[in-house]
Amino acid sequence: MRVYIFLCLMCWARSDKKKTCLEFSRLSVKDSLRDLFVPQLEMFLMMYTRNNFNCAEPLFEQDNSLNTNFNTSKKTIWLIHGYRPIGSIPSWLQNFLRVLLDQDDINLIVVDWNRGATTFIYNRAVKNTRKVAVKLSESIHNLLKHGASLDNFHFIGVSLGAHISGFVGKIFQGQLGRITGLDPAGPKFSGKSSNDRLDYSDAKFVDVIHSDVNGINFIKCDHQRAVYLFMAALKTGCNFISFPCTSYKDYKIGLCMDCDDFKKKSCPRLGYQAELWKDILIERIEKRSLRTTVFLDTTGTQPFCTYYFILSIMVLDKTMKDGHITFKFLNQLGIVEEARLYEKNTSFYKLQEVKILAQLLNDVNISSIGLTYFQTSNQLCLTCKYSIYRLMLKSVTYPERPPLCNYNVSLKESEEVFLNLSTCMPQEI
């Protein structure tokens, strides 16, 4: 009886013991000042899975065995922060962890190199990026011994973290599955050779969101917004559609709305889903150039999403080449939706289809379009008109939605006409 009671008490005592959770290094300005005289560099790996979302665990146990929550058959995301001049924890970190684990059943490893990124000497943090990459490569070699695969590794690096990801990729000769650079740091990297910065050759698939041109690129508005755009693309139901183009100037005047090269997958999307276009993008690299540059516009606040449509017009004959047409988009309530049109001055020729890219701020059902024709001359022309054979509106953001049409329209000068839209003829869908 005494033995039985003793064993029960032992079991109770053990079950009451709580596991210690790892925490991101909490540093401050004092640590930045201390670094001026005593430089430090430490790296910690904090592992999360859906089994331990609220409690970060070490990737390896004290005996160097692999954490039992790590599944070598699943994708592994490595999240690497950047320069932290006053040692603060990245404000986006916890939210990023949540949206990534909500999106996919993965191994998620936060690379905490705050002791090394926290310094007033930016150049020192830059030099530490290569050292962190070497430390990471040692842990990766250990994972490979346990059966992990480089092809399943997706590095997401922010600022200096993007270049750390690139240096890791170089160590493994470009065999990492994917690297995503979110606003890669420019100072001390811009203009450098491919060996000294993140490069498209550092992984099998490299995508970058920043304000310069490189890799498969998405153009953004301001510093570090890339992080929030990437998260928004995960959290919202909006497709952040982007358009392949040689320059932002050409994109703005509507010269780059053709995504036929991307086949049935339509235009590529920003963020986590960009890898759906991996095979097509690699094929484009082999056939044409070393990288694909794409553009998109966003709103200034979360969730940042806008909605793209292509408005195509086919005229019956060449009527007034010196005129232009204005457009209004009306929703089902008859309210005008603000639209941005990407277009240049275009002459209309018989049975030629002219496409205009339109961007709306709201995801609404467009029920009608208002058109007004103006000629360039100041003199009123009562006989001037455009004869439109077909007008078609198709969503680019949601290509699965059927296009809407109207047929046989005559526009007189300065006279606004509202056209109700309905399903297009079967042969045109």
What are these regions (language model features)?
Residues 83-86, 114-118, 160-162, 185-188, ...:
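Solvent-exposed loop/turn segments at secondary-structure junctions
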Residues 177, 181-217:
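The feature captures the conserved acid-bearing segment of alpha/beta-hydrolase catalytic domains
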Residues 104, 172-175, 202:
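Short, structured coil segments at secondary-structure junctions
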Residues 110-112, 181:
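A short glycine-rich beta-strand->turn/loop micro-motif centered on a GG-aromatic cluster
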Residues 81, 155-168:
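Glycine-rich nucleophile elbow surrounding the catalytic serine of serine-hydrolase chemistry
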Residues 2-110, 117-128, 138-150, 196-200, ...:
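Flexible, membrane-associating and regulatory peripheral segments of lipid-active enzymes
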Residues 135-140, 206:
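Short, well-ordered amphipathic alpha-helical segments that serve as non-catalytic structural scaffolds
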Residues 147-159, 179:
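Alpha/beta-hydrolase fold nucleophile elbow
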